[in-house]
Amino acid sequence: MELLLRFLLLCGVADFTRGLSITTPEQMIEKAKGETAYLPCKFTLGPEDQGPLDIEWLLSPADNQKVDQVIILYSGDKIYDDYYQDLKGRVHFTSNDLKSGDASINVTNLQLSDIGTYQCKVKKAPGVGNKKIQLTVLVKPSGIRCYVDGSEEIGNDFKLKCEPKEGSLPLRYEWQKLSDSQKLPTSWLPEMTSPVISVKNASAEYSGTYTCTVRNRVGSDQCLLRLDVVPPSNRAGTIAGAVIGTLLALVLIALIVFCCHKKRREEKYEKEVHHDIREDVPPPKSRTSTARSYIGSNHSSLGSMSPSNMEGYSKTQYNQVPSEDLERAPQSPTLPPAKVAAPNLSRMGAVPVMIPAQSKDGSIV
């Protein structure tokens, strides 16, 4: 009995003199991106721990390519939280009195770059203690898109797809029919790890509203899908319409090309004709040359007339400037009257008359 009491007393003294100790166990924490992670670090002090209290948090990045980074420090009754730029303004002590034995921190607005091992170090000479916490940041499923891949017609095969825009693996998929019996057809065998349901030989009873829920360890999201299985459409009419439309389009294009070509040919012909006319037409004569030609022709006519025939004509004034009448273009001569045959003249009562012949100088022969 006495030996037992001595053993218990020694154990109590050893525990009392153990000094500084961190009571928080090492652990792993999983949080979603954008949330706040609480990293605990609680400690106790011994009576011999009389030195200044120093608290330091370190981060060992997950890629193991960077050295340990100091993210927050308490020393000399002051807090320093601007050591690590990636966490600046996002890491804080949870307690206002760190000497009470709580060195826990909060990391807000978590990012994927925050993944790593966090180490809490507490020192109060001669006592020293440290603990490690593994932090994992996951992305919740979000931006889920549900759609049908294929033709929703009776007898056809198609697929129902459920695709998240983002989300950390592993992901699990759960399909459910909201209308009617709220059960999937027995022929469908969706896998929890596959985002696709293959539908074979679709029937009208497959129509309805479906929901797809995507989950991982930190959250979930879902989308709705409306499925309408309809009778097959008249494909022959559709194909015929497409062919006719294509032919009409080709005819229209050919007509436009023909009209454009014809218009270009007409414009080219007009330009060539206009150019030929301008080359063939001689330049117009001046008014002075016209007048001179007219005067010369008059002189020739007068010279050929006999003196007896010139009595009715006045003498030409050669010392005067030609009048405006001479400058005018000569008029075309009038045609002589049609000749009548002699027998016709006798029938008409004409009397034959003898006209004496004249020589070139005007004398009667």
UniProtKB/Swiss-Prot annotation:
Q: Where is the composition biased (Polar residues)?
A: 286-322
Q: Could you confirm whether the keyword Manganese appears in this record?
A: no
Q: Which GO terms describe its biological process?
A: actin cytoskeleton organization; AV node cell to bundle of His cell communication; cardiac muscle cell development; cell-cell junction organization; epithelial structure maintenance; gamma-delta T cell activation; germ cell migration; heart development
**In which compartments does the protein localize?**
Cell membrane; Basolateral cell membrane; Cell junction, Tight junction; Cell junction, Adherens junction
The residues that the database entry marks as glycosylated are N106
As for PTM, the annotation reads: N-glycosylated.
Q: Which GO terms describe its cellular component?
A: acrosomal vesicle; adherens junction; apicolateral plasma membrane; basolateral plasma membrane; bicellular tight junction; cell body; cytoplasm; filopodium
Q: Does the keyword Kinase apply?
A: no
Matches recorded under InterPro entries: EJ_Adhesion_Regulator (IPR052307), Ig-like_dom (IPR007110), Ig-like_dom_sf (IPR036179), Ig-like_fold (IPR013783), Ig_sub (IPR003599), Ig_sub2 (IPR003598), Ig_V-set (IPR013106)
- What are the entry keywords? Cell adhesion, Cell junction, Cell membrane, Disulfide bond, Glycoprotein, Immunoglobulin domain, Lipoprotein, Membrane, Palmitate, Phosphoprotein, Receptor, Repeat, Signal, Tight junction, Transmembrane, Transmembrane helix
Among PROSITE patterns, the record links this protein to: IG_LIKE (PS50835)
Entry superkingdom: Eukaryota
Task: Extract one GO molecular function annotation from the record.
Answer: cell adhesion molecule binding
Q: Which SMART domains match?
A: IG (SM00409), IGc2 (SM00408), IGv (SM00406)
Describe its membrane topology. Single-pass type I membrane protein
Signal peptide (from-to) = 1-19
| Composition-biased stretches (Basic and acidic residues) | 269-282
Q: Which residues form the Ig-like C2-type domain?
A: 20-136, 141-228
What does the comment on domains in this protein's record state? The Ig-like C2-type 1 domain mediates homodimerization and interaction with JAML.
- What role is this protein assigned? Component of the epithelial apical junction complex that may function as a homophilic cell adhesion molecule and is essential for tight junction integrity. Also involved in transepithelial migration of leukocytes through adhesive interactions with JAML a transmembrane protein of the plasma membrane of leukocytes. The interaction between both receptors also mediates the activation of gamma-delta T-cells, a subpopulation of T-cells residing in epithelia and involved in tissue homeostasis and repair.
**Protein name per Swiss-Prot or TrEMBL:** Coxsackievirus and adenovirus receptor homolog
Species:
Bos taurus (Bovine)
Lineage from the top down? Answer: Eukaryota, Metazoa, Chordata, Craniata, Vertebrata
